[in-house]
Regions:
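Phosphate/diphosphate ligand-binding glycine-rich loop within oxidoreductases
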Residues: 41-43, 47-153, 278-280
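Rossmann-like adenosine-cofactor binding region
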Residues: 206-284, 289-290
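Positively charged, low-complexity intrinsically disordered leader regions
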Residues: 3-71
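C-terminal helix-to-coil terminal segments
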Residues: 8, 286-321
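Short, structured coil segments at secondary-structure junctions
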Residues: 76, 106, 126-128, 186, ...
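Glycine-rich phosphate/diphosphate-binding loop of Rossmann-like nucleotide-binding domains
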Residues: 59-71, 154-233
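Helix-enriched interaction subdomains in cytosolic or periplasmic regions
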Residues: 2-31, 114-142
Length: 321
C-alpha cells in the first residue's frame, strides 16, 4: 500500500523519537487526543480511519502498548494485522528488512516494538508507509511519552514548569529517556532518583543540561517526594540486565507506600508506565495521587491522535458530528 504516497523514512509522518515533534505539534496532538476521549470511551463512533490497516509488529512482550494501539485503530473504524516473533517467519530467521517489506504491502501504517535500539529508525528507512516507534530496546518510546504528557496536562492543566521526579531504572528505562527530553522542553525541573548502577546515561543527562535543563541526581527517594508535582515510578527491568547477580543487587530498591505520600502536595500525581512489580504498594491505588491506571487508558486517545497525524487525517473540532 506504499503506492498511496504516505511519507516514510525521514518523513514527517514517522514518530521515532520526540525530536520528530515540535512543541506546538505536541500540544496540537494532545488537543486532538482530548477531543477523541469520547471515542476512546466508546461513547461516540468516529470512523476517521475507516479503510486503513495498521500493521502491529511486536518483537518484545507488550500488553498496554499493543492493545491500546489496536483499540485506537478499531475505535476509529480501521483494521489491524498483528505480527510477533512467535508464530511468524521471524522465528524462521527472516530479517527485519524482509519483514518490513511485507508490512509495507499489507498495511497503511506500522507500529513496531523491537529489542534492538535503532530498529524503529531502520524500519522507517526501509519502507514507504509511516512508522511509529513503540519502543526500541533501551532507546526511545515516544508514543508512551505522548500519553504521559497527556496525563500530566490532564492533572495539572499545563506542562510548563513542573517538578518531576523520575524513579528507578533510569539506565535501561526507555520511557524515562523519551519523557525527560520532552519535559525539559516545557521547563520542567527533573530529579533523577536511582541507584548508581542505574543512573540515567551520561549522554542523556549531558544533553538535557546542554539545553539549559535543571537536573538533579540522587539516590534519596524519600527526600524527593515533598516538592514533586509528578512522581514517575518505574520497575527495575530484569530482562535488560546481562548479569542476574547485578539485577539482584538493585531489585526492590525503591518501594512507594501510601504512608510515604503523607508529605506530598495535594495535587501531586503518581505515574508508572506499567507493569509494576513491587515499586508501588497497592495501598497507593486508592489515594488521590494514583494516576497509573488512568495513564494506561490515556494511551487509547493519544494513540488515536498519533495515528491520525501520521496518516494525514485531521481530527475535527467536534468529533462525531
Amino acid at each position: 500500500m506504499a503506492a498511496l504516497g504516505f511519507v516514510g523514512g525521514q518523513g514527517m509522518s514517522d514518530l521515532i523519537t520526540m525530536d520528530d515533534l515540535s512543541n506546538d505539534e505536541i500540544l496540537d496532538i494532545l488537543d486532538a487526543a482530548e477531543r477523541l476521549l469520547p471515542v476512546a470511551n466508546g461513547d461516540v463512533y468516529a470512523p476517521l480511519l475507516q479503510g486503513k490497516v495498521l500493521g502491529n509488529l511486536f518483537f518484545e512482550n507488550s500488553t498496554r502498548t499493543r492493545m491500546s494501539f489496536e483499540s485506537a485503530m478499531k475505535r476509529l473504524g480501521g483494521e489491524v494485522v498483528n505480527l510477533s516473533s512467535v508464530g511468524s517467519s521471524v522465528a524462521k530467521g527472516e530479517t527485519l528488512y524482509d519483514t518490513m517489506q511485507m508490512v509495507d504491502g499489507y498495511s497503511d501504517i506500522a507500529v513496531i516494538r523491537h529489542p534492538r535500539q535503532g530498529a524503529a529508525q531502520y524500519s522507517a528507512d526501509a519502507i514507504g508507509i509511516p512508522v511509529l516507534n513503540a519502543g526500541d530496546g533501551a532507546g526511545n518510546h515516544p508514543t508512551q511519552t505522548m500519553l504521559d504528557l497527556f496525563t500530566i496536562r490532564q492533572a495539572h492543566g499545563t506542562l510548563e514548569g513542573l517538578n518531576v521526579v523520575l524513579v528507578g531504572d533510569l539506565r535501561y528505562g526507555r520511557t524515562t529517556h523519551s519523557l525527560s527530553h520532552a519535559l525539559v522542553r516545557f521547563g520542567a525541573k527533573l530529579t533523577l532518583v536511582s541507584p548508581d548502577s542505574l543512573r540515567m546515561p551520561n549522554e542523556i543527562v549531558g544533553d538535557l543540561q546542554s539545553h539549559g535543563a535543571d537536573v538533579a541526581e540522587t539516590e534519596n527517594f524519600a527526600g524527593s517526594i515533598a516538592d514533586a508535582d509528578v512522581i514517575y515510578m518505574t520497575r527495575i527491568q530484569k530482562e535488560r540486565f546481562p548479569d542476574e547477580d547485578e539485577y539482584t543487587k538493585v531489585a526492590g530498591i525503591y518501594k512507594m507506600t501510601a504512608d510515604d505520600l503523607a508529605v506530598a502536595k495535594a495535587g501531586m500525581i503518581v505515574m508508572h508506565p506499567l507493569p509494576r512489580v513491587d515499586e508501588i504498594h497497592p495501598s497507593v491505588d486508592s489515594t488521590q495521587h494514583a494516576r497509573y491506571f488512568q495513564q494506561a487508558f490515556n494511551g487509547v486517545p493519544t494513540r488515536m491522535a498519533l495515528l491520525c497525524r501520521s496518516l494525514g487525517i485531521e481530527v475535527p473540532k467536534e468529533v462525531g458530528e
